[in-house]
């Protein structure tokens, strides 16, 4: 068995020799490395913790509700709206800082290099120009990579991590202030360093961090700065603000508030309502107009004109006045757009496949090595990218005659060109007077300027240049995404796709004779096709692109192209963000399960090996349970016995638990008496028996299936009260799986808080003497609750008793063992649950379900077992 545990059985992952896997908990499966594909088996996986999106309605929370009236409710709602507005404004200011810094560094770099190239073209010292460009790029990339060493979670775009967070997975450090600082400064250095990355993706992460941290008014990174702000101290509230912040990030990046709202809905949040929709849209609007206000004032000096809605502006698409037959697009063009969507889906699937292999190589060979290796890899990517850009511009670029269109652009494009200096958009590197280098015009401009060139400058790029640019950019962008620098993928994908679309337009014009088609439209459709093939978003991306173009007539072709690209790409692999989520082993829950999973029931996927606590438990037992398990919640149970009165006489602790059990049993007669209706027709002895007797008698048990039986045996009751009577190998199956009446759930964080604050009572006293904590005191340490291993045991009396009933959740969501998996999945995902108890018909807990039991890989394993038992 040891051999099976230490290695992975590749030929028969679920065969008899690996039978031990079937008894492992979902946490063990995650730690030991179960993956969906055999080729991914060597990749490490991590036991991610879930977030508490379900509200715990315990006694402290009920006390808060009792003090709540309409006035306080309106005040709470008003504070939430103000916080949402502040999140939008702060996200817009973050975008303004990133954009201003990138422009400053990029203009400085290109200005120095362009002057050097112009001088060295005649003197023959181009190697010096290359060294200057390398000096700038390597310095910026080195700084970006160093920031990732400080906070590794700042690497990449952050969209996969935020998607996981909104799905209910706690990714360590993802919404910390230090992460925000490293992400913001890192992305401006990586973009300024000439890497083929974008700043729009990290803006989504930055907005999410602002949304998570601003309502707390405190930070782990700045522990001394604390405010007594009593609101929003739960994962449930933080999730809503993170959704708003992520949407604000999209809105600030693209000037698309509606698209940002739909992005947060489509890619992130598992729970949504009308009130949250309004707040998210308001937050997105606040971010968009904050950024627009300051950018318009800084760049044009016209404060309040609102001319630049986002970091990326596509400009207005408009045919030239001289071409009367030109149309933005016609019905005949839809056929070409569908074909481009298919090609974009294939290219996106290829991009994702190559990037996945690179990511797996990094996880095997780069990440296990010293952190300096990651910095060296980033510098290597920067070195190769810089050399390729410089050499391609010098060798592969064509010198083309500068036309009036190239010099000034059309009227719709004039505003954008003027804001960035007309002379900087057309590069004459290595070309004589009155000509320009088309390859250098794409490579030696910012990515946003290059996209605008492809969208609006007609006839400025040859097909050979576009093809070479696409190939080089495709390969280098694929290599760059995943390195240890903050990096986005939206703009590189748009630029790569725009080059592909312009290439298609040039071919149709030159070889098919469609001289009146608008090249900018094909560039936009190509950008949408490639981006859709990479990220596989449809609804939100359609709206984002429409808002960015400010042209509603593009709605149909963009939507058709994105749908075709997604369907084509899905035939081969998942979107790039889902690929990276899968490689990291995050237990992400999709929108729904496969149809065949309905063959399984809750009893097939639940974990029957339970670690539980009693309503009244000694501190010694609680500490033992907390220190020997990694579970984050424990069922609160009492044992189901018929001879309970025998044990109530000699043990006060057992007596307290049995009394709680009897008081918690609700009967129809007891409820009727509570409501004050007349019960005089019932004899008092009969009424007493009805109120106190057990809910139902148990049927004879079958020997074949002990896991689903709840039998009564003559064993010692409540063994978990005494650590020396904890489950042992000598116990029978009946003793291990004894019948347990379910009363509620208590979280690990709640138990540790009770121990830290000394909430307990002596056995000689009544449980009413136990100190009580308020809701504010229970949530004071949120989100960093104390750890049980940091607890000083010398300060605790192990014989003291803790009454957990006031602090447990007495009414969590539960399911029957016969509930189909699709119903379990929908309940778990839509309600944002962390634990789902499985309770039988007589109120006894028989198992518990976590998100690890609902992952696709776990369900596939259980489905294979189901087929084997048929």
From Swiss-Prot:
Q: Provide the reaction this enzyme catalyses.
A: 2 chloride(in) + H(+)(out) = 2 chloride(out) + H(+)(in)
If researchers knock out this gene, what phenotype do they report? Reduced pain sensitivity and moderate behavioral abnormalities, but have normal fertility and are generally not very different from wild-type.
Domain of life of the native organism: Eukaryota
Which residues are recorded with the post-translational modification Phosphoserine? 774
Residue span of motif Selectivity filter part_2: 198-202
Q: Which organs or tissues contain this protein?
A: Detected in whole brain and in hippocampus neurons (at protein level). Detected in brain, trigeminus, dorsal root ganglion, spinal cord, eye, kidney, testis, skeletal muscle, thymus and pancreas. Isoform ClC-6c is expressed only in kidney.
Q: Which residues are glycosylated?
A: 410, 423, 433
Topological domains on the Cytoplasmic side lie at: 1-80, 573-870
**Which ranges does the record annotate as intramembrane?**
159-166, 241-253, 257-265, 520-534, 535-537, 538-549, 550-553
Gene3D superfamilies the UniProt entry points to: CBS-domain, Clc chloride channel
Instruction: List the residues marked with site Mediates proton transfer from the outer aqueous phase to the interior of the protein.
Output: 200
> Residue ranges for motif Selectivity filter part_3?
488-492
PTM section of the record: N-glycosylated on several asparagine residues.
Against Pfam families, the record matches this protein to: CBS, Voltage_CLC
Q: Which GO terms describe its molecular function?
A: antiporter activity; ATP binding; voltage-gated chloride channel activity
The UniProt entry, under InterPro entries, shows: CBS_dom, CBS_dom_sf, Cl-channel/antiporter, Cl-channel_core, Cl_channel-6, ClC
Q: Where are the transmembrane segments?
A: 81-113, 128-150, 176-194, 200-217, 277-294, 335-364, 371-392, 463-482, 488-512, 554-572
Q: Where does ATP bind?
A: 631-633, 850-853
Can you give the residue ranges of the CBS domain? Answer: 606-663, 808-869
Question: Where can the motif Selectivity filter part_1 be found?
Answer: 156-160
> Which family does the entry's similarity section mention?
Belongs to the chloride channel (TC 2.A.49) family. ClC-6/CLCN6 subfamily.
Protein name, as recorded: H(+)/Cl(-) exchange transporter 6
Q: Which organism is it from?
A: Mus musculus
């Amino acid at each position: 068995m040891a051999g099976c545990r230490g290695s992975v059985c590749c030929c028969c992952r679920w065969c008899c020799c690996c039978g031990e896997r079937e008894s492992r908990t979902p946490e063990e499966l995650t730690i030991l490395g179960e993956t969906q594909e055999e080729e991914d088996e060597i990749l490490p996986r991590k036991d991610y913790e879930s977030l508490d999106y379900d509200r715990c309605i315990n006694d402290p929370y009920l006390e808060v509700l009792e003090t709540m009236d309409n006035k306080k409710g309106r005040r709470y709602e008003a504070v939430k709206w103000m916080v949402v507005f502040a999140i939008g404004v702060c996200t817009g200011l973050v975008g303004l800082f990133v954009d201003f810094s990138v422009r400053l560094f990029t203009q400085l770099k290109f200005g120095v290099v362009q002057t050097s190239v112009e001088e060295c073209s005649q003197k023959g010292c181009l190697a010096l120009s290359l060294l200057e460009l390398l000096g700038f790029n390597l310095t910026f990339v080195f700084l970006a990579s160093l920031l990732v060493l400080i906070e590794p979670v700042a690497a990449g775009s952050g969209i996969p991590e935020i998607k996981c967070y909104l799905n209910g997975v706690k990714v360590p450090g993802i919404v910390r202030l230090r992460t925000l600082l490293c992400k913001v400064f890192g992305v401006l250095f990586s973009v300024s360093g000439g890497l083929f990355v974008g700043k729009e993706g990290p803006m989504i992460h930055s907005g999410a961090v602002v949304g998570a941290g601003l309502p707390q008014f405190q930070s782990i990174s700045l522990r001394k700065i604390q405010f007594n702000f009593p609101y929003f101290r739960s994962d449930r509230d933080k999730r809503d603000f993170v959704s708003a912040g992520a949407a604000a990030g999209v809105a600030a990046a693209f000037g698309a508030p509606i698209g940002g709202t739909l992005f947060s809905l489509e890619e992130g949040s598992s729970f949504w309502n009308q009130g949250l929709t309004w707040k998210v849209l308001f937050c997105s609007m606040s971010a968009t107009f904050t950024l627009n206000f300051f950018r318009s004032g800084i760049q044009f000096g016209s404060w309040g004109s609102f001319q630049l809605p986002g970091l990326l502006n596509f400009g207005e698409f408009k045919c030239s006045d001289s071409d009367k037959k030109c149309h933005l697009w016609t019905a005949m063009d839809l056929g070409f757009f569908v074909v481009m969507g298919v090609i974009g889906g294939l290219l996106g699937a290829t991009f994702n496949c190559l990037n996945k292999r690179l990511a797996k190589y990094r996880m095997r060979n780069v990440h296990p090595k010293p952190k300096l290796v990651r910095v060296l890899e980033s510098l290597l990517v920067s070195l190769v990218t810089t050399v390729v850009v410089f050499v391609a511009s010098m060798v592969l670029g064509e010198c083309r005659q500068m036309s009036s269109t190239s010099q000034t652009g059309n009227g719709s494009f004039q505003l954008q060109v003027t804001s960035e200096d007309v002379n900087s958009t057309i590069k004459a590197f290595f070309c004589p007077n009155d000509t320009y280098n088309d390859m250098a015009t794409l490579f030696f401009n910012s990515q946003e300027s290059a996209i605008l060139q492809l969208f609006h400058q007609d006839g400025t790029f040859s097909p050979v240049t576009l093809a070479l640019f696409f190939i080089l950019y495709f390969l280098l962008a694929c290599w760059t995404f995943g390195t240890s620098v903050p990096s986005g993928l939206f703009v590189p994908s748009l630029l790569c796709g725009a080059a592909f679309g312009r290439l298609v337009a040039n071919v149709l014009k030159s070889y098919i004779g469609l001289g009146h088609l608008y090249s900018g439209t094909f560039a936009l459709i190509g950008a949408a096709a490639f981006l859709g093939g990479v990220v596989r978003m449809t609804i939100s991306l359609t709206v984002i692109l429409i808002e960015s173009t400010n042209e509603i007539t593009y709605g149909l072709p963009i939507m058709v192209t994105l749908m075709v690209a997604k369907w084509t790409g899905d035939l081969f692999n998942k979107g790039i963000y889902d690929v990276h989520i899968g490689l990291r082993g995050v237990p992400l829950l999709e929108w729904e399960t496969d149809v065949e999973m309905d063959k399984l029931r809750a009893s097939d996927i639940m974990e029957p090996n339970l670690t539980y606590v009693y309503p009244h438990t000694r501190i010694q037992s609680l500490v033992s349970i907390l220190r020997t398990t990694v579970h984050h919640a424990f069922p609160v149970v009492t044992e189901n016995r018929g001879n309970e009165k025998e044990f109530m006489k000699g043990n006060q602790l057992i007596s307290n638990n049995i009394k709680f059990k009897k008081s918690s049993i609700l009967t129809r007669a007891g409820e009727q008496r509570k409501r004050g209706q007349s019960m005089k027709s019932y004899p008092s002895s009969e009424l007493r028996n009805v109120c106190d007797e057990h809910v139902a008698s148990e049927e004879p048990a079958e020997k074949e299936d002990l896991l689903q039986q709840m039998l009564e045996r003559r064993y010692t009751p409540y063994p978990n009260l005494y650590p020396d009577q904890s489950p042992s190998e000598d116990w029978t199956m009946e003793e291990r799986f004894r019948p347990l009446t379910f009363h509620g759930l208590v979280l690990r964080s709640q138990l540790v808080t009770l121990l830290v604050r000394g909430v307990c009572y002596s056995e000689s006293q009544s449980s009413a003497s136990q100190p009580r904590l308020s809701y504010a005191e229970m949530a004071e340490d949120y989100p960093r609750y104390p750890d049980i291993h940091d607890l000083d045991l010398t300060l605790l009396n192990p014989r003291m008793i803790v009454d957990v009933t006031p602090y447990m959740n007495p009414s969590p969501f539960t399911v029957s063992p016969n509930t189909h998996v699709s119903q379990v999945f929908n309940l778990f995902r839509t309600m944002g649950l962390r634990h789902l108890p499985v309770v039988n018909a007589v109120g006894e807990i028989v198992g518990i379900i976590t998100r690890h039991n609902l992952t696709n890989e776990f369900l596939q394993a259980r489905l294979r077992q189901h087929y084997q038992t048929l």
